[in-house]
Amino acid sequence: MLAAKSIAGPRAFKASAVRAAPKAGRRTVVVMARKNEVSESYAKALVELADEKGKLEAVHADVDAVAGLMKENAKLSALIMNPVVESDKKRAVLAKIAKEAGFQQYTINWLNLLVEKDRLSLVPEICECFEDLYCQMTDTQVATLRSAVKLEQEQQFLIAKKLQELTGSKNIKLKPVIDSSLIAGFVVEYGSSQIDLSVRGQIERVADQLTKEMTAKLS
């Protein structure tokens, strides 16, 4: 029986998880077909190095944090992506962020390499590719959890544990999204599947049933 660990903390950037302990030894990474082979190569190199050094979870948290910052901080993203801004300034900004966040040295070296090779514009895609490879290596199913209000950590943990049973995945990673249109309850989306336990979903199902019944009576 898989033991469910506690939900990930702030550095997970709004992503909760139930994780299994990683297997010892280096794991094989198979890169899925993507548009940018350069992004693939940077992500693959980092994920393999982190796994080899036994720092995969820590580096994954770092990359998750970088991806979150790029999405949520428009000014930072604009500065990083701007080809006119000098490399030294970009390196200094990233160094400050890395120090405050407590990034692993492997992550810092990776960011510096991207500055040196003028590849910072690929950061979002590299982060996506890293996430894909990480999930592949750790048998992690990523699921989007949409709810009308923010769910408590314990609620998220229980949902993740249930999904673990339904999917058979060793690990489940929830990405919470607030959607006030749901009224109450939540919707979980993973792969091509969806579990709708929202009030809006219930209303729509009732309305659909009533429509069918009325149509049947009139026909």
Curated annotation (Swiss-Prot):
UniProt keyword annotation of Membrane present: yes
Q: Where are the transmembrane segments?
A: none
Q: What's an example of a GO molecular-function annotation for this chain?
A: proton-transporting ATP synthase activity, rotational mechanism
Swiss-Prot/TrEMBL keywords: ATP synthesis, CF(1), Chloroplast, Hydrogen ion transport, Ion transport, Membrane, Plastid, Thylakoid, Transit peptide, Transport
Q: Name one Pfam family in it.
A: OSCP
Q: Provide one Gene Ontology cellular component.
A: chloroplast thylakoid membrane
Which compartments is it annotated to reside in?
Answer: Plastid, Chloroplast thylakoid membrane
Q: Where exactly is the transit peptide annotated in this entry?
A: 1-33
Quote the Gene3D superfamilies the UniProt record gives.
N-terminal domain of the delta subunit of the F1F0-ATP synthase (1.10.520.20)
The record's PROSITE patterns line, in alphabetical order, gives: ATPASE_DELTA
Q: Which domain of life is it from?
A: Eukaryota
Q: Which InterPro entries match?
A: ATP_synth_OSCP/delta_N_sf, ATPase_OSCP/d_CS, ATPase_OSCP/dsu
What quaternary structure, including any partners, is listed in this protein's UniProt entry? F-type ATPases have 2 components, F(1) - the catalytic core - and F(0) - the membrane proton channel. F(1) has five subunits: alpha(3), beta(3), gamma(1), delta(1), epsilon(1). F(0) has four main subunits: a(1), b(1), b'(1) and c(10-14). The alpha and beta chains form an alternating ring which encloses part of the gamma chain. F(1) is attached to F(0) by a central stalk formed by the gamma and epsilon chains, while a peripheral stalk is formed by the delta, b and b' chains.
- Note from the entry: In plastids the F-type ATPase is also known as CF(1)CF(0).
The family this protein is said to belong to: Belongs to the ATPase delta chain family.
The free-text function statement in the UniProt record for this protein reads:
F(1)F(0) ATP synthase produces ATP from ADP in the presence of a proton or sodium gradient. F-type ATPases consist of two structural domains, F(1) containing the extramembraneous catalytic core and F(0) containing the membrane proton channel, linked together by a central stalk and a peripheral stalk. During catalysis, ATP synthesis in the catalytic domain of F(1) is coupled via a rotary mechanism of the central stalk subunits to proton translocation.
- Alphabetical list of HAMAP family matching this protein: ATP_synth_delta_bact
Q: What is this protein called?
A: ATP synthase delta chain, chloroplastic
